[in-house]
Amino acid sequence: MASHLADVQAKPIPTNTKLFSMLALLNAYVPDSYLIMEECQQILGPPDPIYGGPPFEDRMKPFSDLLRVSGSRVDLVHPDIAMKRLADLNIRRSSVARSCIFLLCGEQAQPNTVRFVKDLLTKREMGQKGKEKFSHLIKDIIKEETFGQALRVLKNASNKFKDKHIFPQTVARLYYVGGSKPNFKKAEIWAKEAIERAQNNSYAADTLGQVYKNHLLKKVKLPYEIKGIAEKAFEAFRDVENKAQRELGRELSEWVGSGNFSDGFNNRGHFGFIQVAKIISGKYRRLHPFKQTLKSEVEDKFEFFEWYLSYSKLDKITVEPDYFWKDVATCYKAYTGEDAADSTSFPALVDCLNHGLFVSKERRAKFSVTEKTQSDLEQIRDELKTDYENNVDDVQVAERYVLSNIILSNKVPDSPQQPLVIELQQILQRFLSTGVHESDPEFYLLVLLLFWPEENPRTGEENDNEELNTPETEEDQLRDQPSEEVSINKDDPGENPEQPPLGLISDPDLEHCVTLMEKTYDNVYGKYLRGRYLLPLFFLGKGRGLSRWIHRSRLDAVVQRHVETESDNDPSEPNPNKTKRKKINHMWKSGDVWELPEIQNMLQPIQIETTQQREEAKVTVDCVGGKNITSRIDDKPIKSPVRFYLGFNIRGPVVFYVGAPLNASE
C-alpha cells in the first residue's frame, strides 16, 4: 500500500485510484452516498468483466478491502476513515470534486449521483447562528487549499448544471463572504444569473438581496451610496417576498400541475427587509431619508414576526438563531420608538408570560426583559378593557381583552372567577351571533377555552351554565324571556352592548368551532407556518374556570428549574448556557417533561377514542357530559401511551401522548 501511494505522486492518477478518491470524497462529506456499479465500470474503462475483463475487486486493488459492494451499489466499508485515505493519496479535494462533476454527471447520469454531487458542493449544515455559509467541502477547500480553487470548483459546477440556480447562488455568496476581499460587483452578476435560471423561485431571488445587504454593511459609507444600495436591497427583498407568497406547499404538487413548491414559507424577504432597514438606521445618525416612508412597512414586518415566532418554531426543539428577534425588535424601535416587549397584540399577549424565561426569544436576544408581574398584567387588562368598552364592535379588541384575563389568571390562579367567566362568555357569544369573527382562528381559540366542558363543582356533572339563566334581577328576568319579547335600544347609553341576553344564544357547538378554527388557520396562517412546529399555547389543567388553562410558560419554568438544579451539581461545565438549552430541549423531545411531579400536578389527564374512520393524525377527546371533540395529536411516544394531556395551538386542540419513561439505553 505504501509503495503504491509513492507511485501515485509520481505518475498520472490510475483509474482505480481516481474512482476510489471519488468514493472517498462522497462518503466523507455526503452520508449514505454511493455509486452504481455501472458508473464505476465506466470510470475504470474497458475491459468490462462481462466481456471477459478481470473482476471489479481485482481491478480495485489495493483498495478492495476498503470497498463494499451491495447489489449494484458501491461505497466504503468505513466512511469515517475516508478522509484519512484521501490525505494518504495526497490528492487535492478540489481535484476530486471536479472529477465528480465531469466524470459522474454526464448526460446519462444517475439522478441519485447528481443529488450526491449537488449536496457535496452546496448543502449547508445548521450551525449555532443559522445555516453555515457553505458546504463542509467548500469550507475545507478554502481552508486547506485556496479561495480560488473553491471558486473554480463551483464555477465548473455552475457551467455543468446550467439548469440549477443553486450553483450561481453559491458562487455569488463566495464572492461576497467567502474571500478576504469581497467582490460585490461579481457577486451581483452571479446572483442575477441565479434569478435568470429560476425566475419564480424566492430562494434564488434572496441571494441578490443578500449581496446588497452585505454591501451596505461592509463597504458603503457615503450618504448617496447608502441611499442607492439600500433602494436596490429593498427592491430585491420585496421581490423575494412576492415570490414567496406565490409558492405552494409540496403537498399540493400532485394537484397543481406546475408551479414553484417549497417545504416551508421563505421568510427571508421579510427578514432581509428588516435587516436592511436596521442597517441604514444605524448609518443615518441624523437625517434619515427613509424613516417615515419605511415606518409602516417595518410595523407590518414586525407584526408578521410577532405571530410567526409566538405561534411556531422551526421544529420541536429548534428555534430561529438568537440574533433573529434582536434584529426585528431593534429595527422596530428604531422606526417607531416603541419597545417590542410593551406590545399588547394578541400574539404578544400569548408570549408575554415567557419574558424572563431562559428559553424566551428575549433572553436569547440578550434583551434585559423581565418577567411580567401581576401588577403589569392587571394594568394591561384594565387598559384593554377600556379599549374594548370604547370599541365594542371590534372583534380583535375584544379578543385581546378576553385573552388578557386568561393570561392574568395564570399569575393569580386562585382568584374568584365565575362572574368574570360569564362576562367573557357573553362577549364571545355576542360576536358568535353576528358572524364578524369568521376569518380569525384566535377567536375560536378563545371560544374553545371559555366554553370547554367542565364539571359542576356541586354535582360533579357538566357545568351547563344553569346559574346564568337563573333570574335574580328585573334585568335578568327580561333576558330570560323569548327573543321576540325583548327590545334592545342600541342607542340608549344605559344599555350595555357588550353583554347581550344570554338566554337568546345557546352554547356554541365546539366540534363545529374546531372545524372552523382549522379552516381559518389554513386561510390566515397555513401558508406561512407550513412545515413548522406549532407551539402549544395552553394546556388543560386541574383548576376551574380560567384557572383550568395552563400557559406553556408555566411548564417551561418547571423544566428550567429542574435543569438548573441538576446543573448546580456540575459547576465544572465549560458552557453552562449551551448545556442548559440542550438539556431543556432533550426533556421536551424525550418526553421527560411529562414525568416531572410539578407538571403532573398541574395538568388534567384526559380520555380519548380512536376509530378506523378518523384521519391518522386525529383522535376524539371524551369530555364531561358525553361530548366528543376531535383533536389532532402531537408526536406519539416510543412506548405505549399511559396517559394523555390536552393542549391548544393556533390551529386547534392537540392531544399529547405520554408514554412510559424511557431508560438510559433508549
Indicate where each model-derived feature is located:
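Extended alpha-helical scaffold/coiled-coil
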Residues: P111-S631, P641
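Amphipathic alpha-helical segments of the small helical/lid subdomains adjacent to P-loop NTPase cores
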Residues: M1-L19, Y51-P55
